[in-house]
Amino acid sequence: NAAILYIWVTPEESRRKNADRADPNGPGSNLHHGVPLAVMLGEYGCDDMEYLVNTSGQKGTVTVKAHGNTYHVPIGIFDNRVDKTSFLRAEPSAWDAALVEDVTCAIRQATDTMWAGYRK
């Protein structure tokens, strides 16, 4: 069993976030890691998830053909093309309640969609 929670960010926004979050003094940190630009361009330079969703054999899924079988993996999409998450790197005491509500609702919508497809 599987499901996909996809965080939708444009490649340009992904590179911007990568540069903003990278801390050269803590490169092993989960919250402040950075990926070299060559890797960002070579491995994350395009986004094919929209194509995979739009060409899937079943709505709300990504079709995967493997080992002689066809799987329809449910997907929930958290649209973060307009940044909803960067504020979360600050101390929680500094978080704006309206921003917390916005990101919470957006993630809940994506996970509810994903879970509904998973339970079918």
Identify the residue ranges that each predicted region occupies.
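Conserved GTP-binding G-domain of TRAFAC-class P-loop NTPases and closely related GTPase folds
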Residues: 4-120
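Substrate-engagement module of ASCE P-loop NTPases
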Residues: 1
